[in-house]
Structure formats: C-alpha cells, structure tokens
C-alpha cells in the first residue's frame, strides 16, 4: 500500500510540474485573452474564475487557466508552477478523471491517480465547464507512516 501511495503522490507532483511548465507557452492577444499553442483561451477578467476547495477550505488560486485537448484527454492547468493545480480527464461526457495534482497543502503533497486504489475522483461537464470532486491522498512528511486523505472540489471553465 505504501508503494502505491508513493507512486500516486509522485505521479501527481510530476503532473502538476509538467502541466504548469507547459502552461508558460502563452502569447497575449490585444483583446486581453491568453491563447495557448493549442488555441484554447482563458480570459483573465472572467467573472467565473477557477474555484478550488480542499478539505472544505477555499484555496486562493491565482494565475491563468490553460486547457488543452490531445489524444483523447483534456489537460487542465490552473495557476503557476509553484502553486499549480492540474487535472487530466478523458474528453468524454461524462469525463473520466485520470489524475489530479493539488500541489502542497499545509506540508502535504496531495494527488489522485486512477487505478492505484488510493483516493477517488469523478467529474461532470456542462459545455466547457468542468467540476471535479473526490478525495486526494498524500503523505505528511512530519508523519510519513500515516497517509492523509482530503476531499477536494475543482470548478473551472475552459474556453
């Protein structure tokens, strides 16, 4: 079990770093929109920005939202490299959650990866609006023998 948990947390951390790194490939247009290489845009002045709640506490996530679709997956990155949130979903309706990386929350790196038996996640899609909910797992380095489980909710609109 410890090995599966370690793999899940490490995979989520790599996912967050990778997607956040990819999100820096942006160009700004004159209309105030950010366009990724894949053509997905996120308006920085949009009234309904991303919402991230972990363990019942609203997380103040700042930065852009970058959504790309490739190989049947929707990759969602929110925020920057240091505080980034990332998710990979299938592009079906309803989408299936493949992985979620929530980054470091109070000293615990939290994540979910399907197929590991650790945590759970589900997603709904309404147009370009996604809602991802579940339970992420992590390791508190102050007590590494005791896995940490925290509920999460992510709401984001890809445009």
Curated annotation (Swiss-Prot):
PROSITE patterns: PROKAR_LIPOPROTEIN. Residues 1-21 form the signal peptide. A lipid is attached at residue 22 (S-diacylglycerol cysteine). Residues 24-51 are annotated as: Disordered. Changing residue 22 to A: Protein not released into host cytoplasm (uses recombinant M.vaccae to infect mouse macrophages). Keywords: Cell membrane, Cell wall, Disulfide bond, Glycoprotein, Host cytoplasm, Lipoprotein, Membrane, Palmitate, Secreted, Signal, Transport, Virulence. A disrupted strain immunizes mice against subsequent infection with wild-type H37Rv as well as the M.bovis vaccine strain BCG. It is found in: Cell membrane; Secreted, Cell wall; Cell surface; Secreted. Transmembrane segments: none annotated. Induction: Expressed in cell culture; expressed at a steady level for 4 days following infection of human mononuclear phagocytes. The keyword Transmembrane does not apply. One of its GO terms (biological process) is defense response to bacterium. Residues 27-49 have a biased composition (Low complexity). GO terms for molecular function: host cell surface receptor binding. Coiled coil: none annotated. Disruption phenotype: No visible phenotype in culture. Grows less well than wild-type in human monocyte-derived macrophages (MDM) over 7 days; increased human monocyte MHC class II expression, decreased interleukin 1-beta secretion from monocytes and MDM. No growth in C57BL/6 mice over 40 days, even in mice lacking gamma interferon. It is a lipid-anchor. A lipid is attached at residue 22 (N-palmitoyl cysteine). Residues 41-60 are annotated as: Prevents bacterial uptake by a human macrophage-like cell line. Triacylated with a thioether-linked diacylglycerol with C16 and C19 on Cys-22 and an amide-linked C16 fatty acid. Modified by Lgt on Cys-22 with an S-linked diacylglycerol with a mixture of C16, C18 and C19 fatty acids (palmitic, stearic and tuberculostearic acid), signal peptide is removed by LspA, modifed by Lnt with an amide-linked mixture of C16 and C19 fatty acids, expressed in M.bovis. Disulfide bonds join 67-158. InterPro entries: LpqH. Belongs to the mycobacterial 19 kDa antigen family. Based on its structure might be involved in ligand transport. A host TLR2 agonist. Plays a complicated role in bacterial interactions with the host immune system; some effects favor the host (induces interleukin 1-beta and IL-12 p40 (IL12B), both increase the host's immune response) while others favor the bacteria (increases growth in monocyte-derived macrophages and decreases host MHC class II (MHC-II) expression and antigen processing). Induces host (human and mouse) IL-12 p40 (IL12B, a pro-inflammatory cytokine) release by monocyte cell lines via TLR2 and CD14. Forms a U-shaped beta-half-barrel with a large hydrophobic cavity. This is Lipoprotein LpqH. It comes from Mycobacterium tuberculosis (strain ATCC 25618 / H37Rv).
